[in-house]
Amino acid sequence: MSEAVPTSARKSKNAPVAPGPAPVLEIESLDMEARGVGRTVTEDGTPGKVIFVEGALPGERVTYSSYRRKPSYEQATVVDILRPSVLRTQPKCAFFGTCGGCSMQHLDMRAQVAIKQRVLEDNLWHLAKLRAETVFAPIHGPSWGYRYRARLTVRNVAKKGGVLVGFHEKKSSYVADMTSCEVLPPHVSAMLVPLRRLVEGLSIRDRMPQIELAVGSQVTALVLRVLEPINADDEALLRAFADEHKVQFWLQPKGPDTVTPFYPLDVPLDYTLPEFGIRMPFKPTDFTQVNHQINRVLVGRALRLLAPSRDDRVLDLFCGIGNFTLPLARLSREVMGIEGSDTLTTRALANARENGVDGHTTFACRNLFEVTGDDLRALGAFDKFLIDPPREGALAVSKALAEIAQSGEGPLPKRIVYVSCNPSTLARDAGLLVHEAGYRLKGAGVVNMFPNTSHVESIALFERG
């Protein structure tokens, strides 16, 4: 809220008001959304409001314009950079700053990884009073062309000259007018404009709100969300586009369970884990990692940390389609995968059979957000756990392990590898595992699964004894 202006100082309502100079701010750090963070200083020299400035980097001196004001903080955008950071780089994408797909292209990649590591360490310390005994070397790979999964929004916008296909604009429901994308694989980026033209020619151009993208090892799948049936002319256009661009179309008339392949029908969608001789078939609506190259390294790192042997019984929680379960089955006596989705559980079992490891695997569908100590006891003894939860984390699992440890009734795994996509829920769960279940945080490090974004993926190792 702006301050009241004394009556004597008020101008005529018709008189022009010259804007004052933009305020100046020293940027001290970045927050979880890749915004520069600084603090104003009051007239008496005491700290004032915290200012979150989009587009600013640590060490920079900037002027800014606030678009949201609260009593203790403001949100703002950069007006001018008076002293640039040595870590500032030229964004590769012409649409950076407008498109909401990326938030850190203006920051050197090594600095991006270092900042994500600091975010991980800060969360562990501030939320759980923990420091890892070892900081793992970051897992990183290609910075561009890595995004093998994406949800593209489709809008027929007359003011923009036709159909738009792309990510949302930053902090907006509008679709970015983008004709290429540096984080999508090059062949997908090159398809954005042809996709516009394709949709413009369809009878349901106003009834197709999104296209789901999933790139496999042999084919790129495009799932069209269709709110009305397509006609014969539409079918012909889709087939011609698929043949020209070597893609596979799927149609989704309602929920995810209604997704069916349209054309071509004979090309399998899969990804591979060559280190373990695994080929992983999946449907384009299944959860798979966005970055295939990083996923391969991550699976290898996780298994080396877990160090399974032929005598070990391993529990893989939130197993999905078997991304960790199947490689673990190559090295363990037995692996049990538990997943909350019936569909993914069925897919994991089929993938185990496909790869010839069904003799070493079992799968079950359970709600892991409501699991108890008694539920874990009923599963029997496991030597090691691998936990790979969604952003909500594994709170119920962590509480169940703490309950078993404090009761002294029931076996506990001697080692846990926890793969996280949210540092705050990892820190929360780590606090339970260490302070209440008796584990040590042996190591933790970041996984740069999403370069040029503020998303922080990480991996942590816990041991008892």
From Swiss-Prot:
Belongs to the class I-like SAM-binding methyltransferase superfamily. RNA M5U methyltransferase family. RlmD subfamily. The active site is at 421 (nucleophile). S-adenosyl-L-methionine binds at residues 289, 318, 323, 339, 367, 388. Transmembrane segments: none annotated. The lineage of its organism: Bacteria, Pseudomonadati, Pseudomonadota, Betaproteobacteria, Burkholderiales. Catalyzes the formation of 5-methyl-uridine at position 1939 (m5U1939) in 23S rRNA. Residues 16-80 form the TRAM domain. It comes from Burkholderia ambifaria (strain ATCC BAA-244 / DSM 16087 / CCUG 44356 / LMG 19182 / AMMD). GO terms for molecular function: 4 iron, 4 sulfur cluster binding; iron ion binding; RNA binding; rRNA (uridine-C5-)-methyltransferase activity. It holds the Pfam family tRNA_U5-meth_tr. Gene3D superfamilies: 2.40.50.1070, Nucleic acid-binding proteins, Vaccinia Virus protein VP39. This is 23S rRNA (uracil(1939)-C(5))-methyltransferase RlmD. Keywords: 4Fe-4S, Iron, Iron-sulfur, Metal-binding, Methyltransferase, rRNA processing, S-adenosyl-L-methionine, Transferase. It is an enzyme of class 2 (transferase). InterPro entries: 23S_rRNA_MeTrfase_RlmD, NA-bd_OB-fold, SAM-dependent_MTases_sf, TRAM_dom, U5_MeTrfase_fam. Residues 1-22 are annotated as: Disordered. Its EC number is 2.1.1.190.
